[in-house]
């Protein structure tokens, strides 16, 4: 069994909690409230900054240009097309520039971002890739899950439903598959001596993913 499969098997309960969260389920069936999605989107926009920092440091720590290239391409997507997508989405959600530029990070957003940035500075390239395997792998998994269930939140014809459908469609194999496969290949080369640390990172990142969904769904002060 590969290292990645071992990690997913050992922490399957957490993995499934992240992929099958009620936030995702309601996103797929179109019943997720605008308030909950807006809170998620505002916090995710803040979180992306720390994810980009981690990816940038990963590029610098990569052992070769070949290993760095997929992460660099992922980083370019975050800083380019994805950032533009967020700006357009805020307009759709009725959130103006003053509002989204002045949103404060909620505690879970801050904690998750701090965890990733600290790991980026202190950890190895493989350790960073382990965290990214969670952050990107979970998103690919829930996107594939909703597609397999033929989720169609746009069926009611509402603007919000169409937006939800677009968000689901964005998280697909074409967009996330390359970086997830790259991180999987890096993690699968881990030696036994590295495993305790990788397991800890994988578990912590998953706990933060679940907490992020909880925060988006329930709110936080």
Show the residue positions of the predicted features.
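Amphipathic, well-ordered alpha-helical segments in soluble domains
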Residues: 19, 47-54, 81-85, 108-112, ...
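Alpha-helical bundle segments that constitute or directly flank the non-heme di-iron/ferroxidase center
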Residues: 12-17, 31-61, 81, 130-140, ...
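Short alpha-helical hairpin
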Residues: 8-32, 51, 181-189
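Hydrophobic alpha-helical segments
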Residues: 2-3, 7, 115-116, 214
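Acidic, carboxylate-rich catalytic segments that either coordinate divalent cations
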Residues: 199-221
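A structure-centric feature marking long, well-folded core domains of fungal metabolic enzymes
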Residues: 3-14, 65-67, 96, 164-167, ...
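Active-site-proximal alpha-helical scaffolds that flank and shape metal-associated catalytic sites
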Residues: 68-175, 207
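Long amphipathic all-alpha helical oligomerization modules
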Residues: 173-202
């Amino acid at each position: 069994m590969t290292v990645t499969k071992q990690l997913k098997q050992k922490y399957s309960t957490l993995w499934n909690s992240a992929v099958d969260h009620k936030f995702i389920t309601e996103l797929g069936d179109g019943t997720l409230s605008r308030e909950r999605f807006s809170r998620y989107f505002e916090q995710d926009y803040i979180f992306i900054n720390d994810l980009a920092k981690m990816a940038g440091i990963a590029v610098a720590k990569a052992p070769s240009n070949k290993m760095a290239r997929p992460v660099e391409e992922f980083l370019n997507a975050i800083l380019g097309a994805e950032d533009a997508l967020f700006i357009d989405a805020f307009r759709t959600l009725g959130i103006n520039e003053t509002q989204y530029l002045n949103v404060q990070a909620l505690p879970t957003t801050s904690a998750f971002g701090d965890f990733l940035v600290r790991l980026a500075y202190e950890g190895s390239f493989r350790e960073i890739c382990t965290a990214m395997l969670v952050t990107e792998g979970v998103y690919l998994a829930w996107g594939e899950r909703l597609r397999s269930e033929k989720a169609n939140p746009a069926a009611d014809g509402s603007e919000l439903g169409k937006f939800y459908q677009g968000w689901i469609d964005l998280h697909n194999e074409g967009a996330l598959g390359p970086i997830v496969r790259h991180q999987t290949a890096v993690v699968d080369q881990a030696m036994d001596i590295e495993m305790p640390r990788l397991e800890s990172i994988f578990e912590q990142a998953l706990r933060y993913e679940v907490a992020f969904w909880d925060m988006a769904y329930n709110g936080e002060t």
